[in-house]
Amino acid sequence: MPVESVTVESVDGVRLDAAVHTTSGPVRGTVLLVHGITVDMDEGGGMFVRLAGQLAAAGFNVVRFSFRGHGNSGGTQRGVTVAGECLDLEAAVQLVEERFRGRFSIVAASFGAVSTVLSLPWLATRLDRLVLWNPVLDLRATFLEPELSWGKENFGPSQQKLLHENGALVVDGEFELGRVLFDEFTHYDPLAGFLDSTVPSLVVHGDRDTAVSYEIAARAAQSRPHTMLHTVVGSDHGFDSREREDEAIAMTVAWLVEQIALSS
């Protein structure tokens, strides 16, 4: 399937790296892929590249992009903020709407769910379906008062001391996050935003996730109308084997194909 590398610009002037996959068959719809924190538009292990290929083969046009401070996009790691990612998502949506007609769907992974869910009030009239992979829905439980081992290791007392003293901490020894982002975590509530929305949704989550709570996501999915939960049994965050990655991809493609058929 043809893949075109493009550049878009957020409203505050940050250049964003993006890719457009155009289906060669009859068009079912368009899907925007929104990656998690510390990775880029390929998503960990290239999952979004493989997902985009399978979606294009199934008749979907696909757009991927890297948030500011990630991949080849402009900005810095330390300058990553929730507000900035919301602006980047807005720019990516504009690219989708410039290239392809009609409503579109979003697949958002991990921290990508935060900007996506917070944007649902203005996305509502544009969005057809929503898929969340291992979504961060509770910022306090993930970052501020971490309940799981990955969060305790990366955002525990010693790391918080570094954040206070130096204005930043380093996640997994390789990605720098600044204090402004952590200040934002006290103000935003993506879980409430997800529960307030009525867009039909699929949540795909591993039940052995050590970074982002499976239980919080599962409860949200089960209490929300028009929402399906698919549990990847035994999987850690990001789907920790090729087999589990393939399961998440296959489930996502099949659900989107089915949903488009139901709505047509």
Label each residue range with its predicted role.
Residues 1-29:
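N-terminal cap/lid segment of alpha/beta-hydrolase-fold proteins
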Residues 5, 16, 114, 125-219, ...:
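The alpha/beta-hydrolase serine catalytic core
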Residues 24-66:
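Short, surface-exposed "cap/lid" segments of acyl-processing enzymes
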Residues 37, 61, 66-76, 136, ...:
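Short beta-to-alpha linker loops that shape the active-site pocket of alpha/beta-hydrolase fold enzymes
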Residues 55, 119-120:
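Aromatic pocket-lining residues of Rossmann-like dinucleotide-binding sites
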Residues 70-101:
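Catalytic nucleophile-loop/oxyanion-hole region of alpha/beta-hydrolase
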Residues 99-110:
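Alpha/beta-hydrolase fold nucleophile elbow
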Residues 108-118:
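Glycine-rich nucleophile elbow surrounding the catalytic serine of serine-hydrolase chemistry
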